[in-house]
Amino acid sequence: MTENPYASPESPLYGGGTQAPAPKAPGLMEQIVGVFTEPTALFQKLRQAPSWVPAVVLFCVLAVAVTLVWGLKVDVDAMLRPMLERNPSVSAGQIDMIIDMQKKFILPFGLMGAVFFPWIGVLLMAFLYWLVGKGMAEGEAPSYTQSLSAASVPALVGLPHGLLIILMALLRPVGGLTPEKLPPTSVGFFLPAENPKLVAALFALDLFSLATWALSFLAFRHLLKLKPAGAVLATFLLVLFQAGFKILFAK
């Protein structure tokens, strides 16, 4: 028997049928659990329903906590004087003046950076991923919102690193160490070096940084659907911005 050609306006033929509900974006707790347990499945869900703001808000909260705990204990003189003394164009009097100024402003400016830099970093990296996706996606190019998810959610695997920094700053003298040098999670913690660029390279080889880069590669493949070469390029850009420039400009 043929179907009734006189379908009612409520029929799907007229667009009035029941439509499937839009996919629901994974919540923040689901994202945190997912990056440690089922990252591929998480990124596939985020492709259908991107989410990024809760992750960045959490990064800001953690960055503020790290800055407060570290900034109240750090010895600014011990942190800056060796670097300034290596610069022959800076006199002893100028060194003292710079250190005195930094002691006053390191905490307020650090807190401002903790609030704004996570947003700026995610927006910038997402734009670069979006550009890569325009030319190196396997099918449809990713949206900017999907790129924002890829730029933020994989970094949730680094949350324990921030908590370790806070714990180490509370339990031991900080001296002139910067936050990333406090927890025993990098090669630089176990292999001391004198050359500033080598020091930066060794501390860049951190367990949580490596995990973030690996998860980001998965996000590029499963969330943005980039070709393998595109995922490699996007991962290279991430490593360049997170580690390469630090090594290049280390003094």
Predicted regions span which residues?
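Selected alpha-helical membrane-embedding segments in polytopic membrane proteins
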Residues: 28, 36-160
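Low-complexity, intrinsically disordered extramembrane tails and loops of integral membrane proteins
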Residues: 1-26
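Short, flexible segments with low predicted structural confidence
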Residues: 17, 103-104, 191-192
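Short juxtamembrane and helix-loop transition motifs at transmembrane-helix boundaries
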Residues: 21-23, 110, 193-199
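Residue-level detector of alpha-helix boundaries and kinks
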Residues: 24-25, 117, 205
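Hydrophobic alpha-helical transmembrane segments and adjacent short intramembrane/lumenal linkers
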Residues: 141, 145-251
